[in-house]
């Protein structure tokens, strides 16, 4: 590590939206952002779980607009930068400008791991705005390390100054992570940073984040109490405790994060964010973690097991944005009975 300061990127107020169906109140956002800021995380990502303009029939309607959430968080911080997420095809460059005006200074432009070419316009515009511009390659387990590296190179060529390996399905192990970081870093410029976004569906969120750092990763996504889609993200307070024991420089207050996780975030969970039968199925089948709540709703409606829906989604290699197929899969399974 050579004393390198890790960049701690909190995603409680974006990925964590999935865990409560995008229903954070503005008071929740202010309280959580204030606690994270006092604990000295580097950035706080804020948006609907599916990014700017994700509030929709397909993904679920939010309790507030992205801009209301971003403004609430921006007003609460003095140290951390406010980040947001943009998926080309859901959010536009106009939405990005509005998010910037509301206080966002970092944007993660997210595409499926084979579709980096759709990010060009959004990355270039973010750079024009002067934003810290990140390329975010979702479902990275569905690409070979070599294929992922080429997609990373594309995002870098458009102007992204940091590229993320994103384990949206929580499906990778430590060797999968190591292989992707080695291959991606080998093709990027020396000054292009890398980041890890882990999910905890196989209980490997923290271990995978540690493996990434050992391969030279600069930025680590994590969330309080693991608040996120599926079994959640790498739990922030757990990663920080582990990093501390490894002697790594993270710059955050562990005990403040522990308090925020248990006092502010865990009480908001209407479904426990944990590894259980359904969330384990996500990781095992390599399914997009935010399919969890949608699949559980379909299972309840049609009287079938959520696990069966999730496994079938994995067999069909469904990816983020295909939430509408969950009901189709449920009906197909019902017809097979």
From Swiss-Prot:
Keyword Repeat set for record: no
GO molecular function: 2-isopropylmalate synthase activity; 4-hydroxy-2-oxovalerate aldolase activity; manganese ion binding
The entry's keywords: Aromatic hydrocarbons catabolism, Lyase, Manganese, Metal-binding
InterPro entries in UniProt: 2-IPM_HCS-like, 4OH_2_O-val_aldolase, Aldolase_TIM, DmpG_comm, DRE_TIM_HOA, PYR_CT
PANTHER family linked to this entry: 2-ISOPROPYLMALATE SYNTHASE 1, CHLOROPLASTIC-RELATED (PTHR10277:SF9), HOMOCITRATE SYNTHASE-RELATED (PTHR10277)
Entry superkingdom: Bacteria
Alphabetized NCBIfam families for the sequence: 4OH_2_O_val_ald, PRK08195.1
Residues that hold substrate according to the record: 14-15, 168, 197, 288
UniProt protein name: 4-hydroxy-2-oxovalerate aldolase 1
Marked site positions, Transition state stabilizer: 14
Organism: Pseudomonas putida (strain W619)
Residues engaged in binding Mn(2+): 15, 197, 199
EC nos: 4.1.3.39
HAMAP family documented for this protein: HOA
Reaction catalyzed: (S)-4-hydroxy-2-oxopentanoate = acetaldehyde + pyruvate
């Amino acid at each position: 590590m050579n004393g390198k300061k890790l960049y701690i990127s909190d995603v409680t107020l974006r990925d964590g939206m999935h865990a409560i169906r995008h229903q954070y109140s503005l008071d929740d956002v202010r309280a959580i952002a204030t606690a994270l800021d006092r604990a000295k995380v580097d950035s706080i990502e804020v948006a609907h779980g599916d990014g700017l303009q994700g509030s929709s029939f397909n993904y679920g309607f939010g309790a507030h607009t992205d801009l209301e959430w971003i403004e609430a968080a921006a007003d609460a911080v003095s140290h951390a930068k406010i980040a947001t997420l943009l998926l080309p095809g859901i959010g536009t460059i106009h939405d990005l400008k509005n998010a910037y005006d509301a206080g966002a200074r970092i944007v993660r432009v997210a595409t499926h791991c084979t579709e980096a070419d759709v990010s060009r316009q959004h990355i270039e515009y973010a750079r024009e705005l002067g934003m810290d511009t990140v390329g975010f390659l979702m479902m990275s387990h569905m690409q070979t390390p070599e294929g992922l590296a080429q997609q990373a190179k594309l995002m870098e060529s458009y102007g992204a100054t940091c590229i993320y390996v994103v384990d949206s399905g929580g499906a990778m192990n430590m060797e999968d992570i190591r292989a992707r970081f080695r291959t991606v870093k080998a093709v990027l410029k020396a000054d292009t940073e890398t980041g890890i976004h882990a999910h905890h569906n196989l209980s490997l969120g923290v271990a995978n984040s540690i493996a990434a750092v050992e391969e030279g990763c600069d930025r680590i996504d994590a969330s309080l109490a693991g608040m996120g889609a599926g079994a959640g993200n790498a739990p922030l307070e757990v990663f920080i405790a582990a990093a501390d024991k490894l002697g790594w420089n993270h710059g955050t207050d562990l005990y403040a994060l522990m308090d925020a996780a248990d006092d502010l975030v865990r009480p908001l969970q209407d479904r426990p964010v944990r590894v259980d039968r359904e969330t384990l199925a996500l990781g095992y089948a390599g399914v997009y973690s935010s399919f969890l709540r949608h699949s559980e709703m379909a299972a309840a409606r049609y009287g079938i097991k959520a696990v069966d829906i999730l496994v079938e989604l994995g067999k069909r290699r469904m990816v983020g944005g295909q939430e509408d197929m969950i009901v189709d899969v449920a009906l197909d399974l019902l017809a097979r009975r």
